[in-house]
């Protein structure tokens, strides 16, 4: 499965807040880290950041936790 920047993907990590949600691949790290794929979502999660009204809308995943949407 070749995932590249800009692809729409569905999250398949069951313990993730974003499980079964669709997001857009923002970047892919090739240095060999465990979760190299950064996925950006339209909505924000439940983590509020001090001084902002929203939460976080990106998360890192392994390629094996993603499927094309």
Swiss-Prot record:
Family statement: Belongs to the PsaE family.
NCBIfam families per the UniProt record, alphabetical: PRK02749.1
UniProt keywords, alphabetically: Membrane, Photosynthesis, Photosystem I, Thylakoid
Gene3D superfamilies tied to this protein: 2.30.30.50
GO biological process: photosynthesis
Organism from which the protein derives: Synechococcus sp. (strain WH7803)
Protein known as: Photosystem I reaction center subunit IV
PANTHER family found in the cross-reference section: PHOTOSYSTEM I REACTION CENTER SUBUNIT IV A, CHLOROPLASTIC-RELATED, PHOTOSYSTEM I SUBUNIT IV
Disulfide linkage: none
Membrane topology type: Peripheral membrane protein
Keyword set includes Membrane: yes
Any one Gene Ontology cellular component term annotated for this protein: photosystem I reaction center
Membrane-spanning ranges: none
